[in-house]
C-alpha cells in the first residue's frame, strides 16, 4: 500500500516574505459607460426585476442605448468549450452538441441586426454511447424530462423575452428542447436541429 503524498511545507516566513505582487488583487474596475434607458413610466409600472435586468445587461457590455430592444431567448444543448479556431479547449460528451454554439452565434448576430436583444442559456446533454454497459444508462431517458423542465424554467426566468429559439441535437437533447418549446405555446418559437448531421465522406454509416 503506497503512503499518502505529503504536500510541501509552507512556513510563516514563506508567506510574509513572498512577492508582494501576489497580494495586489484588483477589486474594482470602471463601470460601463452610458445611461440606462429609464423612463418615469418604467419606474412606476414595470416589475423591479426588469430594472435590475437592465443593469445586468449593461454590466455584460451591451450598449445601454440598445437595452430597450425586444428580448429574444436562444437555448441550446451545447457541450464542451470550442476555441474560435475550432481547437478543443474542453471536450463535450459527444460530437452532436460540439459545434452548435456556432449556430447560436449566427442566430444571435442576426437577431441583433434585426433590432432584437439576444439572450442565450444552455443545458447540455449526455451521450448514452459513452454510458453503454454502465449505470449511466439509467439517466438517458430521465434526462429528457429533467432537461425539458430546466429549459422551461430558463424561459420563464427571462420575463422580458418575446420569443424563443432552441438549438439541440440527438435523441435526448432534441426531444427535451421540443417538449420545452411546446410547453411555451404563448411564445413564438423556432426549433433548430443542429450539430454533426452530415454523412461521413468515407464510411458505411
Where are the language model's segments positioned?
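Metallocofactor- and cofactor-centric catalytic cores in central/energy metabolism, strongly enriched
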Residues: 1-205
